[in-house]
Structures are given as structure tokens and as C-alpha cells.
């Protein structure tokens, strides 16, 4: 069985929920404290043993490439000024993994974005990490899925429970059997209508997929939003070859919409020793 050493991170979206900030700046580069959100995702992949990452980009995404590239002039200035801690942080972002880029030529959905990286992946199993979800966990969320793949040899989809009122916002699984946190899946449903979801187990931005998924994506018809939906292709693959779901452990932060982004920033700031005390005082002074 081949080891999971490659990952895809889709980053071609327009970031419309954050306009006008994302008119010229990629949404993935918006910072939680002093790091862009996409760096948290790449750090998770690196901790899970991923060596090669391909980021699927679109127009106006050059800042992502620049961030993970070395900038010798900046490093020299930091070194000359004795700012060794900042220098280490700047260099760290360039050393996380081997990072490659491919452009998604059309905005045709997540499934289409994954297809854009087919040549890079080849005939290997791979991980997918979506940038809207930062997960804090002792064992990286995607590593938990990799462990299930290595045990079963099958594709594994990361899920977590959501309130029933929110199920229409996600891809949802209809579980067939349960073994601890692991599920065999009867059916995958992309964004079911309110009140029709078969469970409250939602697909949460982490996948380990076998290369066969590309064959299903190649023939996948447009689904929700007139886009090529990855969930629809996974559902078809599941009919032929069992796909598992795994309720991964960890605290998930939704940075794909404004309120979640603000909440995440506050929580991360409160975990930071350098600002916790003053921020706590400020929040109390608001008297909310």
C-alpha cells in the first residue's frame, strides 16, 4: 500500500464573503494573528507527514506563492537588525513542505479544482485539506484519516457533528455501520434541503482519497450550484468501492465566513501569552 505523501489544497475561490478585502488580496492570505490562514492548513499537512503539496489557485493569487517563497532581502534585514525570532518565523514558512501550484482555469466547483491537480497526483492516494477549516488537535485531523486509510486501504472522509439546523450548509453522510469513530457510509448527500438530512454528521474539509476518484470526477455532471461537486463523485465511487467516514477529534474553527473568522481570531489571541491579559481586560471593559 502506497503511503500518503501528497496533498491538494484548493485556493482558487473568489472569497466573495470577505469583499472588498479580497478584491486584491487572496482570502487564504487573511491573517489569524500573524499567520495567513493557509499557513495553518499547510502546517497541519506537514505535521501529518505530507511532503508534497499542490495548491490549486486562480487569478490574483500570487501573494500565496510569494508567502511560501524565500525573500532574501527581508531575511538579510532581519538578520542585520538582530531580529532572530522574526527571521526564524519568516524562514519557517518556506520550509514546511515542497509546495507546487496549478491554476484552475474556470470556477466550476471543488470537484473541478481537485481534477486540476490530477497530473501532479498521478496514481497515488492523496489528502485534500480545505482552507475554510482550521483544526486544532493533538493528532492532526488529516493524520487521523491517513491512519484509517492505512488500516482499510479505502478512501476516508472527515466528518464532525453539526446542529440539525445547519445540516443544509454541508455535505452530509448517511451512516451504515459504526465502529468507534469510524463509519461505513450508505450514502453521501450534498447540502440536503432543510429537514431532510439523513444524519447530523457533516463533511468537514478533510479527505484522504484513492486516485480512482479522478475517473469519477472526469464524468461527473454538474450538481448543486451548477458546479462539479466532489461529494457527488465520492457518492458514485462509494457505490462501487466502500468509502469510510471518520469523526475526527479536534476543535474546528470556521474561517470561511466573517463571524467565524472574528471568533477564531479572538480565541487564538486569548491563547497567546503576549496579549491574553490585555485582551481579556479590554473585553471586560466593553461591558457586553
UniProtKB/Swiss-Prot annotation:
Q: What is its EC number?
A: 2.7.7.9
Which pathway, per its entry?
Glycolipid metabolism; diglucosyl-diacylglycerol biosynthesis
Name the catalysed reactions: alpha-D-glucose 1-phosphate + UTP + H(+) = UDP-alpha-D-glucose + diphosphate
ATP-binding listed as a keyword: no
The Gene Ontology biological process terms listed for this entry are:
enterobacterial common antigen biosynthetic process; UDP-alpha-D-glucose metabolic process
Question: Keywords, A to Z?
Answer: Carbohydrate metabolism, Nucleotidyltransferase, Transferase
Q: Which Pfam families match?
A: NTP_transferase
| EC class | transferase
Q: Which GO terms describe its molecular function?
A: UTP:glucose-1-phosphate uridylyltransferase activity
Q: Which InterPro entries match?
A: GalU_uridylyltTrfase_bac/arc, NTP_transferase_dom, Nucleotide-diphossugar_trans
Which domain of life does this protein belong to? Bacteria
Does the UniProt entry include the keyword Nucleotidyltransferase?
yes
Q: Which PANTHER family match?
A: UTP--GLUCOSE-1-PHOSPHATE URIDYLYLTRANSFERASE
Function of the protein: Catalyzes the formation of UDP-glucose from glucose-1-phosphate and UTP. This is an intermediate step in the biosynthesis of diglucosyl-diacylglycerol (Glc2-DAG), i.e. the predominant glycolipid found in the S.aureus membrane, which is also used as a membrane anchor for lipoteichoic acid (LTA).
Q: Which family does it belong to?
A: Belongs to the UDPGP type 2 family.
UniProt-recorded name of the protein: UTP--glucose-1-phosphate uridylyltransferase
| Source organism of this protein record | Staphylococcus aureus (strain MRSA252)
Taxonomy-wise, where does this protein's organism fall, top ranks first?
Bacteria, Bacillati, Bacillota, Bacilli, Bacillales
